[in-house]
């Protein structure tokens, strides 16, 4: 066989240079394979509840940490030093994409992210700079590659992005919103411009996720955190088509990267199907508040569906069927319970979900005051429940 694309060849060599994975339970669960134990990781497992993170933040502002691979890796590693987690997730933020598109994003203490010059009208879309956006996000790829080596194969590394609707909401509202009323108004007032906006974001997201996979991400999560503001009809209009396009376009691109034949020598896997696994990462969709559309989510082609805490996992399994992995879905507020009560809740959650095709997690990111002991209890309970 002959090499048709040197870039593809170099990509595969780069991916194979990473240390071999020692704990692959997360990836096995996502693929529906037998696991040694129920894998567990926690959304926002790296962050403000850890004193070592707070110390680092005294020296560096939030986005400096995100943009500096050494600092991003340090924060990513912090929870792994404390807890027996089955995954790491690169420290970053979904709003790096609006930044790369030319918008200013500031992190205000006690408020959260603020975009001082939001997109108010369709005319403002001209301010966005999608050309070259990926080149302004390479620091994330650098952090992912660095982190894969620092992990030394301990656990898989997850990359992530915000979904188009969620990013559009922040960019229109100028930050977080309890209603997303301005963004929702676009769906009715500017339907064609909304489509153009969402397509623009989708295309940048696909570029961004492809870069993360090539950098070394072994799983990807797409955060549709603002789905809770959409009715089912609105979700199927303003979210679902773009989530589908992300998956389809990404898989198509990554598949094409390894279609050119490569030499079957000892430095490469022994067949094309194994080669594909190097590039086609497993995909998680987490659409918070979109329990009304689980069936539709199950038809998008994602490997894992994340559940928020309002969804009964038994009912979710009945809806999505046996061939999709579920992730979640402990109420983050339960992390403030007494240890014995938390242990009972976590154990009950795992019993409901079972050991097959399940990843234990919370139903949304944990909050800044989460007790460290609660993380210890959750991880231990998830591992020992079955």
UniProtKB/Swiss-Prot annotation:
It is an enzyme of class 4 (lyase). It is found in: Cytoplasm, Cytosol. Pathway: Porphyrin-containing compound metabolism; protoporphyrin-IX biosynthesis; coproporphyrinogen-III from 5-aminolevulinate: step 4/4. Coproporphyrinogen I binds at residues 44, 46, 48, 57, 93, 170, 225, 364. Its EC number is 4.1.1.37. It comes from the Eukaryota. GO terms for molecular function: uroporphyrinogen decarboxylase activity. The record marks 93 as: Transition state stabilizer. It holds the Pfam family URO-D. Gene3D superfamilies: 3.20.20.210. InterPro entries: UROD/MetE-like_sf (IPR038071), Uroporphyrinogen_deCO2ase_HemE (IPR006361), Uroporphyrinogen_deCOase (IPR000257). GO terms for biological process: protoporphyrinogen IX biosynthetic process. It catalyses: uroporphyrinogen III + 4 H(+) = coproporphyrinogen III + 4 CO2. Coproporphyrinogen III binds at residues 44, 46, 48, 93, 170, 225, 364. Keywords: Cytoplasm, Decarboxylase, Heme biosynthesis, Lyase, Porphyrin biosynthesis. PROSITE patterns: UROD_1, UROD_2. GO terms for cellular component: cytosol. Belongs to the uroporphyrinogen decarboxylase family. Homodimer. Catalyzes the decarboxylation of four acetate groups of uroporphyrinogen-III to yield coproporphyrinogen-III. HAMAP family: URO_D. This is Uroporphyrinogen decarboxylase. The gene is Urod.
């Amino acid at each position: 066989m002959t090499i048709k694309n040197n870039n593809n060849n170099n990509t595969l060599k780069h991916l194979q240079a990473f240390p071999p994975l020692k704990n692959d339970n997360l990836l096995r669960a996502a693929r529906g394979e037998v696991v040694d134990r129920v894998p567990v990781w926690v959304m926002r497992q790296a962050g403000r509840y850890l004193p070592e993170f707070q110390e680092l933040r005294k020296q560096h502002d939030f986005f400096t940490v995100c943009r500096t691979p050494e600092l991003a890796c340090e924060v990513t590693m912090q929870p792994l030093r404390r807890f027996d987690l089955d995954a790491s997730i690169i420290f970053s933020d979904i709003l790096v994409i609006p930044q790369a598109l030319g918008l200013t994003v500031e992190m205000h203490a006690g408020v959260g992210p603020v975009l001082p010059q939001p997109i108010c009208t369709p005319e403002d879309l001209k301010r966005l700079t999608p050309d070259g956006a990926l080149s302004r996000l390479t620091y994330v790829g650098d952090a992912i590659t660095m982190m894969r080596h620092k992990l030394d194969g301990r656990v898989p590394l997850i990359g992530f992005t915000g979904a188009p609707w969620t990013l559009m909401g922040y960019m229109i509202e100028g930050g977080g919103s309890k209603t997303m009323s301005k963004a929702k108004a676009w769906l009715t007032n500017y339907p064609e411009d909304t489509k153009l906006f969402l397509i623009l974001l989708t295309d940048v997201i696909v570029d961004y996720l492809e870069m993360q996979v090539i950098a070394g991400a072994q799983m990807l999560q797409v955060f549709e955190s603002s789905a809770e503001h959409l009715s089912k009809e609105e979700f199927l209009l303003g979210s679902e088509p773009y989530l589908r396009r992300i998956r389809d376009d990404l898989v198509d691109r990554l598949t094409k990267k390894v279609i050119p034949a490569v030499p079957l020598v000892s430095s490469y896997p022994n067949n094309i199907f194994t080669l594909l696994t190097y590039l086609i990462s497993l995909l998680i969709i987490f659409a918070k508040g979109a329990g009304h559309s689980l069936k539709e989510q199950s038809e998008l082609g994602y490997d894992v569906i994340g559940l928020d805490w309002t969804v009964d996992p038994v009912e979710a399994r009945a809806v999505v069927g046996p061939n999709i992995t579920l992730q979640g879905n402990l109420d983050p507020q339960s992390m403030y319970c007494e240890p014995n009560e938390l242990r009972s809740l976590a154990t009950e959650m795992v019993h409901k979900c079972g050991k097959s095709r399940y990843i234990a997690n919370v139903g949304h990111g944990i909050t800044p005051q989460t007790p460290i002991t609660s993380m210890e209890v959750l991880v231990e309970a998830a591992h020992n429940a079955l």
